Amino acid sequence: GNPKRYKNLLGITLGTGFGAGVVIDNCLLTGDNGCGGDVWIMRNKKYTDLIAEESVSIRAVRRVYGELSGEAVDNLTPKDIYDIAEGILTGNREAAVRSFDELGEMAGAAIVSALHIVDGMVVIGGGVAGAAKYILPGMMREMRRSISTFSGRDFDCLQMEVCNLMEPDEYK
């Protein structure tokens, strides 16, 4: 196995809601008020007056699919939308792929904010994580974006290396 050990970790859950657990120096962060890791209530990148969870949840996948496809989503589950993206079920494949990509982008924005405080490995799980092939591109794009100063100087939005460990070509 790999001898590298990590003492700091951000564990992300994508599913009914958007959650996180934070480990710093091998200790679970609970916070003084039991609020350690409350990523769900971070500012939403797209809808800045809403919480992040409105764009990073099962309901977000359904809402975005409905908006993009123009189809009724009352009886669709995220698994159904995943199956549409895969071509297993009929529906608007492009809207299905984009609904997961947008979830990834919005989750990525919140994860970037969290990583400014917690310099550690990110592990992602949860019920919606099964759609990783559609979520991770938007997430990685967001985490690799640049940000600038008024003078026009650009910086990577994260100062640490960002790689997807599911893609062997991305890490050494």
Where are these regions (language model features)?
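Phosphate-binding/catalytic loop of phosphoryl-transfer enzymes
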Residues: 1-50, 55, 62
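ATP-binding/phosphotransfer module of carbohydrate and carboxylate kinases, centering on a glycine-rich
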Residues: 2-4, 43-172
